[in-house]
């Protein structure tokens, strides 16, 4: 079983740990977070406003975090190169601080004995992998990889199925996205774009996202053919992608539904879901798929121009893919 270290015990760090425990496919052996002490880790892991109580045991014992009887070594280092991952037995490190997202910065984990690093965010220079889309291109010479973003993980499987079957000439994506930790609870200063600093609970906030362009990195044939933007909305979790695209080969909407359903039940099972139910965002809270196609929500203007809708739990679905990517990487050792 893959032995994993988690750097940064925030939303993704905690949920990757939950996903790891639930899957039983990887074992978390170490966690580093300079801002959260051990007893606070117990509390934060046990109680979650979005995903509910952890259904298991969690306690602090002998200076370790013990989850379901598994003792996890705790570090509180600010500098990733000082974390002794090797001593704790961690071979793979999930870099989930959101801070060390380049090859150089994430590479600091290798100094402490980690063998591989998975960045749980898009990266400017690390190779990006999306499970079900381009994970087969991973080879073991790569020490540092990125699991891309939650939105890229939602869009890419859908775009792949559509492109493989009908060809995408060009497309625009909008993600209606739940609030995240980088936003402000009330109006405040924002580093980059002024409106990013407006109160998250009060506003629909247009925002940038590199998720659609990143699809071109994981599906090279779509490079330059997709771009997109986000609306941040006042919901705590679950987001939805709207992909509006021009098709090379004409297709009836029923044809599109058929191929997506076939992919969801076949090669992309567990990654891409399919539903014809009258669902809303809450119905996907805690859903482990990267993307669930909403057959009833999409529309076609004509046989070449369509709007496709797909839901995702931007926290938990993504965290499950981080685990899946590590399992896949380990299978190549």
Curated annotation (Swiss-Prot):
NAD(+) binds at residues 11-12, 33, 78, 120, 314. It is found in: Cytoplasm, Cytosol; Cytoplasm, Cytoskeleton; Nucleus. Its EC number is 1.2.1.12, 2.6.99.-. Keywords: Apoptosis, Cytoplasm, Cytoskeleton, Glycolysis, NAD, Nucleus, Oxidoreductase, S-nitrosylation, Transferase. D-glyceraldehyde 3-phosphate binds at residues 149-151, 180, 209-210, 232. The record marks 177 as: Activates thiol group during catalysis. The active site is at residue 150. S-nitrosylation of Cys-150 leads to translocation to the nucleus. The keyword Glycoprotein does not apply. The modification S-nitrosocysteine is found at residue 150. GO terms for molecular function: aspartic-type endopeptidase inhibitor activity; disordered domain specific binding; glyceraldehyde-3-phosphate dehydrogenase (NAD+) (phosphorylating) activity; identical protein binding; microtubule binding; NAD binding; NADP binding; peptidyl-cysteine S-nitrosylase activity. The keyword Oxidoreductase applies. GO terms for cellular component: cytoplasm; cytosol; GAIT complex; lipid droplet; microtubule cytoskeleton; nuclear membrane; nucleus; plasma membrane. Has both glyceraldehyde-3-phosphate dehydrogenase and nitrosylase activities, thereby playing a role in glycolysis and nuclear functions, respectively. Glyceraldehyde-3-phosphate dehydrogenase is a key enzyme in glycolysis that catalyzes the first step of the pathway by converting D-glyceraldehyde 3-phosphate (G3P) into 3-phospho-D-glyceroyl phosphate. Participates in nuclear events including transcription, RNA transport, DNA replication and apoptosis. Homotetramer. This is Glyceraldehyde-3-phosphate dehydrogenase. It comes from Coturnix japonica (Japanese quail). The lineage of its organism: Eukaryota, Metazoa, Chordata, Craniata, Vertebrata.
């Amino acid at each position: 079983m893959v032995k994993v270290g988690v750097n940064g015990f925030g939303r993704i760090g905690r949920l990757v740990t939950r996903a790891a425990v639930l899957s039983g496919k990887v074992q978390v052996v170490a966690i580093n977070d300079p801002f959260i002490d051990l007893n606070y880790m117990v509390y934060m892991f046990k109680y979650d406003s979005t995903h509910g109580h952890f259904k298991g045991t969690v306690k602090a014992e002998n200076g370790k975090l013990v989850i379901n009887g598994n003792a996890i070594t705790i570090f509180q280092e600010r500098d990733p190169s000082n974390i002794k991952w090797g001593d704790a037995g961690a071979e793979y490190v999930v870099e989930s601080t959101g801070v060390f997202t380049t090859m150089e910065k994430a590479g600091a984990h290798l100094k402490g004995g980690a063998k591989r690093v998975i960045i749980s965010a898009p990266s400017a220079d690390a190779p990006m992998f999306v499970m079900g889309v381009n994970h087969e291109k991973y080879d073991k010479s790569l020490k540092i990889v990125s699991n891309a973003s939650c939105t890229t993980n939602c869009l890419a499987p859908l775009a792949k199925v559509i492109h493989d079957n009908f060809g995408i000439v060009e497309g625009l994506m909008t993600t209606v996205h739940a609030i995240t930790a980088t936003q402000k609870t009330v109006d405040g200063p924002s580093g980059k774009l002024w409106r990013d600093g407006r109160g998250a609970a009060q506003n629909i906030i247009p925002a940038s996202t590199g998720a659609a362009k990143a699809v071109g990195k994981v599906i090279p044939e779509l490079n330059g053919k997709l771009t997109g933007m986000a609306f941040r909305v006042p919901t705590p979790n679950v987001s939805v992608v709207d992909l509006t695209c021009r098709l090379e080969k004409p297709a009836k909407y029923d044809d599109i539904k058929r191929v997506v359903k076939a992919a969801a039940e076949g090669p992309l099972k567990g990654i891409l879901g399919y539903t014809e139910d009258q669902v809303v965002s809450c119905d996907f809270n805690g859903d482990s798929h990267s993307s669930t196609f909403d057959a009833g929500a999409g529309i076609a203007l004509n046989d070449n121009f369509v709007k496709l809708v797909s839901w995702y739990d931007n926290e938990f679905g993504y965290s499950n893919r981080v685990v899946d990517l590590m399992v896949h990487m380990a299978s190549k050792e």
